[in-house]
Curated annotation (Swiss-Prot):
InterPro entries: AAA+_ATPase, ABC_transporter-like_ATP-bd, ABC_transporter_ATP-bind, P-loop_NTPase. Keywords: ATP-binding, Cell inner membrane, Cell membrane, Membrane, Nucleotide-binding, Translocase, Transport. This is Taurine import ATP-binding protein TauB. Residues 2-229 form the ABC transporter domain.
Amino acid sequence: MLQISHLYADYGGKPALEDINLTLESGELLVVLGPSGCGKTTLLNLIAGFVPYQHGSIQLAGKRIEGPGAERGVVFQNEGLLPWRNVQDNVAFGLQLAGIEKMQRLEIAHQMLKKVGLEGAEKRYIWQLSDGQRQRVGIARALAANPQLLLLDEPFGALDAFTRDQMQTLLLKLWQETGKQVLLITHDIEEAVFMATELVLLSSGPGRVLERLRLNFARRFVAGESSRSIKSDPQFIAMREYVLSRVFEQREAFS
């Protein structure tokens, strides 16, 4: 379980997050949404251990987070892949740094690529892949170390609508299959409503928890309902419009 208590953080000398209290249970998919500058990415970087926080605590499985760790896998919008390595070696890179024996890490990489639909692409290079395929490699790399918690920072923001829909459904299937805790940062309201089992709305900076919503659209998808059917459901449309109105309230209040 991820537990965040009374978290305060600065960014560039200014308050970025203020009194954040969140819990992410095992098997849940938490989505954080808010206007630009609300501290979404700062929150992910704090959980990942990339930057320090000023007050409060972040704990995963009862252990305080004070730096990066293999129990947290991170996927970025710009992937951060190594262009001089092939796909398989990119996925296996973290395992290599951890001292995993070569044959074992290549087998793990193969299995992760199979999970994300890139079996057979092991020897291709990053420049030979589409944007969506590169994000699949990034997800496979993050999963290779078998983390307890998967963190994703607007991973589909630069993708076209069709590819973004494919990646959303892939991530939900992986979430169901692995049972991992997932925390997704996004600025896309429809994506947030579709994918979250719990949706957290942040206020304009400094970010505070404005509202928490329990949603069931992601569970309906993994139970077999199509994404098209879900997104055309009046309940989904109403929730999307409600969340949109809350985000616009924050934009107007601080404009």
